[in-house]
Amino acid sequence: MPSQMEHAMETMMFTFHKFAGDKGYLTKEDLRVLMEKEFPGFLENQKDPLAVDKIMKDLDQCRDGKVGFQSFFSLIAGLTIACNDYFVVHMKQKGKK
């Protein structure tokens, strides 16, 4: 039986491939659909309607309109770090009360 971390890794891999399909990469449209389905709260809180376009530009390092798994994982890592930073600040504030 996989551990929670192994399950989390498996979920990230399966999610990427679910949206990438057989081609093995995400297009901007694939990324938009993935973000809408898997990160609806993140997109709802964005004040910029071009958020997905900007994310795609940041992730598409080769400028070929494709986002591979490594770039996708860097997005997940960045979002996780931001969430952790918020969590740490929130917990410190909660502890001061």
From Swiss-Prot:
PROSITE patterns given in the database record: S100_CABP (PS00303)
Q: Which GO terms describe its biological process?
A: membrane raft assembly; mRNA transcription by RNA polymerase II; positive regulation of exocytosis; positive regulation of focal adhesion assembly; positive regulation of GTPase activity; positive regulation of plasma membrane repair; positive regulation of plasminogen activation; positive regulation of stress fiber assembly
In this UniProt entry, which cysteines form S-S bonds? none
Annotated region Ancestral calcium site: where?
Answer: 60-71
Write down the superkingdom of origin.
Eukaryota
- Keyword terms, alphabetized: Acetylation, Isopeptide bond, Ubl conjugation
In-chain residues carrying the UniProt-annotated modification N6-acetyllysine: K23, K28, K37, K54, K57
What does the protein in this record do?
A: Because S100A10 induces the dimerization of ANXA2/p36, it may function as a regulator of protein phosphorylation in that the ANXA2 monomer is the preferred target (in vitro) of tyrosine-specific kinase.
- Miscellaneous comment: Does not appear to bind calcium. Contains 2 ancestral calcium site related to EF-hand domains that have lost their ability to bind calcium.
Name of the protein in question: Protein S100-A10
Task: State the organism of origin.
Answer: Homo sapiens
